[in-house]
């Protein structure tokens, strides 16, 4: 039987500033004592997307307030915390630096150990926090900047078996929202618009379904939507609300079809591990899309697997997942020192080759 451990965690890799306090009991159960998330939607709304410089300044201004709020909500203090955890990458470098510097300051001032956590590991391990999913499990990590299939065999054992070779679905949703003059963030806007639309009105491609493997591509789908939109604007002088809804529905249906087929293929590879309880997990901000969730649940059932999707609040960026990832690692990994660096790019599976088209500056994750 171990001892009780309490972790204060920080997350600031994109446009959500977050802090959380988690406690792992002597018998291994973990409680989220508090989880504070402060979004920046109003700061970026006028620009049609996240502006890194604005995001970084906002993180720097509010991180300490989030920490105070998280400690107060957890009814604890820095003195009672056993460790500090922080997202050290990947992400927008200004925001990651803000979080890392704040965490270093807290660690230095309190003498507490510091743990730099991969943001994607936080997402990938969340099903163990919410549902105590046993290893190994299959994870579809689908977020604003990332999309990959991972075989997860341990807290630090991730094997990528496929992913997007260009735009991640979250990026594609944001770009489609801009094309259709829908508000940002694009994911929820496109999903809302799609509910009123006819997905069959326009013929849109399902990229890479004619090729083997689990890799995906969404840039061609985005281009197809652009061409349809431009044709409508040329023919009728603009877009009507029904045009927006039908294009949203068609785009979303295409994304769902691609994710479903590629997930079925990934399930076949995963089943070769002969897991005791086959489990398909989905995490990341795009996993909040209910059309995607519903279809993936069907894929899991058709493949004889349990489907696990964390609550929506733990799918989008949060610090609770960072704290849990730290708790998972603390038993077998030493803490980081104060030379911990912020990393804009940090592949979870460093042994796999970089994805083709994974980014102009290298592999995102």
UniProtKB/Swiss-Prot annotation:
* Biological function: Required for the formation of a threonylcarbamoyl group on adenosine at position 37 (t(6)A37) in tRNAs that read codons beginning with adenine. Is involved in the transfer of the threonylcarbamoyl moiety of threonylcarbamoyl-AMP (TC-AMP) to the N6 group of A37, together with TsaE and TsaB. TsaD likely plays a direct catalytic role in this reaction.
Reactions this protein catalyses: L-threonylcarbamoyladenylate + adenosine(37) in tRNA = N(6)-L-threonylcarbamoyladenosine(37) in tRNA + AMP + H(+)
Positions that bind substrate? 141-145, 174, 187, 289
What NCBIfam families does its record include? gcp_kae1, T6A_TsaD_YgjD
Gene symbol of the encoding locus = tsaD
Q: What is the source species?
A: Roseobacter denitrificans (strain ATCC 33942 / OCh 114)
Q: Which cofactors does this protein require?
A: Fe(2+)
Q: Which InterPro entries match?
A: ATPase_NBD (IPR043129), Gcp-like_dom (IPR000905), KAE1/TsaD (IPR017861), TsaD (IPR022450)
Q: How is the cofactor bound?
A: Binds 1 Fe(2+) ion per subunit.
Q: What keywords are annotated for this sequence in UniProt?
A: Acyltransferase, Cytoplasm, Iron, Metal-binding, Transferase, tRNA processing
For this entry, the protein name equals: tRNA N6-adenosine threonylcarbamoyltransferase
